[in-house]
Amino acid sequence: MMNRRHFIQISATSILALSANRFAMAKGKSDVDLRIVATTDVHSFLTDFDYYKDAPTDKFGFTRAASLIRQARAEVKNSVLVDNGDLIQGNPIADYQAAQGYKEGKSNPAIDCLNAMNYEVGTLGNHEFNYGLNYLADAIKQAKFPIVNSNVVKAGTEEPYFTPYVIQEKSVVDNQGKTHKLKIGYIGFVPPQIMVWDKANLQGKVETRDIVKTAQKYVPEMKKKGADIVVALAHTGPSDEPYQEGAENSAFYLADVPHIDAVIFGHSHRLFPNKEFAKSPNADIVNGTVKGIPESMAGYWANNISVVDLGLTEHKGKWIVTSGKAVLRPIYDIETKKALAKNDPEITALLKPVHEATRKYVSQPIGKATDNMYSYLALLQDDPTIQIVNQAQKAYVEKVAPSIAAMAGLPILSAGAPFKAGGRKNDPTGYTEVNKGKLTFRNAADLYLYPNTLVVVKATGEQLKEWLECSAGMFKQIDPTSDKPQSLIDWEGFRTYNFDVIDGVNYEYDLTKPARYDGECKLINPESHRVVNLTYQGKPVDPKAEFLIATNNYRAYGNKFPGTGDKHIVYASPDESRQILADYIKATSEKEGSVNPNADKNWRFVPITGNDKLDVRFETSPSEQAAKFIAEKAQYPMKQVGTDEIGFAVYQIDLSK
């Protein structure tokens, strides 16, 4: 039987004490075996087709995952199928659907797929809120299964905005062939930070609550109402850091909440169980458990499915979980580079109309480009994929600024970040690749991945410098005296989409200094300053001078980077950043014949000299196209020195120049 302490109630602070406890699964004989099959972070990657490259792929797609789902369920007598959110956004199929809306009986293709596969229940991810609450409500109505979320409440109340949980009665067959009724409770969670990320869509309508506290509130209620077991559908990532109220990544903390029997989690686009977590004090990657509780996270874009097997024994009229194990089943083997799953015929046929419509939608011509736009070097030097976005944002603001008093006469800058630059160092193919010549809406979607809107903030020169210091956390500190290999990019501690390049000013990064801020833009080295030679129009930036910075709603409302947050916002555009980019390409092409995306090289690294044996390395795409681009466009001498275990090409960069 599970060695687990059952509390009626635990306080928020006691979670720290409980974190030291390890719940161990006893290897007992089970009466009923129950399999939970799960998907997470599908992001409307429904087909095995890359719409950005207009080519098929065997590395992702729900059509392939569906065949693994059917296989996993066919192997056992008792199974349930659940989805963990971030379903309806993230792919050109989703963009096409959002552009069409639900008029004339049109339905959401992602929901259609889950309906066809007979999902039992789903939950919401943070990206479900990107298109607004009305669009989300229309999508939820189409689901033939309940969608649960417990920690989003109606503004100004504690009343759940969505159905917080459900308890479903399921007929199960025991190991002797006898049928029983098992009551399975499902509860859903989303990161509280949606109130920042989608503030424009949510403010005044909903509020969020802490994930762990919400679990402590509802799970005992679910047990009182008869739930034999409780499954948490937690759209939140893992963390071994001490629990803090309001944490974005709370999946591991849920293992401390009494009566939760399994946790399906996601959000961070990682894999669990996986060797990445081998050193986690909370995780058992052999059995797929956290503090004894089965937990699983199935990557992203339907590239994996979670399979969680629970053993249950009936004791005095109650079902008790006596064993649990979680594994992942990938659709593609990264090491052998072989597909492990075929397309499911039913789902493939279901998606054929929307697949063809999406290809047509993203193939709309919008203009021409004079040069290739690849993001292979976006973390190393000024980059064309960011340059063109910043050009578009700046041009847009230049049009609206004169009519808005708070903006008139101020210098206009623009901030952009690489959305596709190797993922979280988990995707060697995850780079923006837009060829010169004819451009289509597909290319605009590749250049600007998210359905953000443009927002303008007003910041001082001092805040501008600190903003760039936050971005400088992308890089590890370089020891100028060492002759050992040193990694340049801090993949583990920093997300590439937080590496803002600000156009309109010039600046340099001194990488021999420690980072002033960490990956969450928290001050860690107050005496360190990496940003040097910051100038505007050739003159040093005055710390007290005011600037307008065009950015996106995610960054502007986040209040994470200096110069952002409510008090700095002077203009919030109703237009999507991607559409602004497409319109800019179209208007410029019509006027000048094409757009010129060549980077203006407004930022660079301070040369590190005096050590001929300095060995600094970075990772990027292993493709021949990338190698050719690097040979032609690199601002620094670079040479490939190997390939890492994930498949990234490893380059050595000469930072003395």
Curated annotation (Swiss-Prot):
Cystine residue pairs: none
Keyword Signal carried by entry: yes
One MF annotation (Gene Ontology) recorded for this entry: metal ion binding
InterPro entries: 5'-Nucleotdase_C, 5'-Nucleotdase_C_sf, 5'-Nucleotdase_CS, 5_nucleotidase/apyrase, Calcineurin-like_PHP_ApaH, CpdB_N, Cyc_nuc_PDE_nucleotidase, Metallo-depent_PP-like
Positions of a divalent metal cation 1 binding: 41, 43, 86, 269
Pfam families tied to this protein: 5_nucleotid_C, Metallophos
The entry's keywords: Hydrolase, Metal-binding, Multifunctional enzyme, Nucleotide-binding, Periplasm, Signal
A GO cellular-component term linked to this record: outer membrane-bounded periplasmic space
Subcellular location: Periplasm
Residues binding a divalent metal cation 2, per UniProt: 86, 126, 235, 267
EC number of this enzyme: 3.1.3.6, 3.1.4.16
Top-level enzyme category: hydrolase
Superkingdom of origin: Bacteria
Leader sequence residues: 1-26
GO biological process, one term: nucleotide catabolic process
Binding residues annotated for substrate, in chain numbering: 450, 554-559
Catalysed reaction, written as an equation: a nucleoside 2',3'-cyclic phosphate + H2O = a nucleoside 3'-phosphate + H(+); a ribonucleoside 3'-phosphate + H2O = a ribonucleoside + phosphate
Keyword presence, Metal-binding: yes
Cofactor: a divalent metal cation
PANTHER family for this protein: 2',3'-CYCLIC-NUCLEOTIDE 2'-PHOSPHODIESTERASE_3'-NUCLEOTIDASE, 5'-NUCLEOTIDASE-RELATED
Function per UniProt: This bifunctional enzyme catalyzes two consecutive reactions during ribonucleic acid degradation. Converts a 2',3'-cyclic nucleotide to a 3'-nucleotide and then the 3'-nucleotide to the corresponding nucleoside and phosphate.
Family: Belongs to the 5'-nucleotidase family.
The protein's name: 2',3'-cyclic-nucleotide 2'-phosphodiesterase/3'-nucleotidase
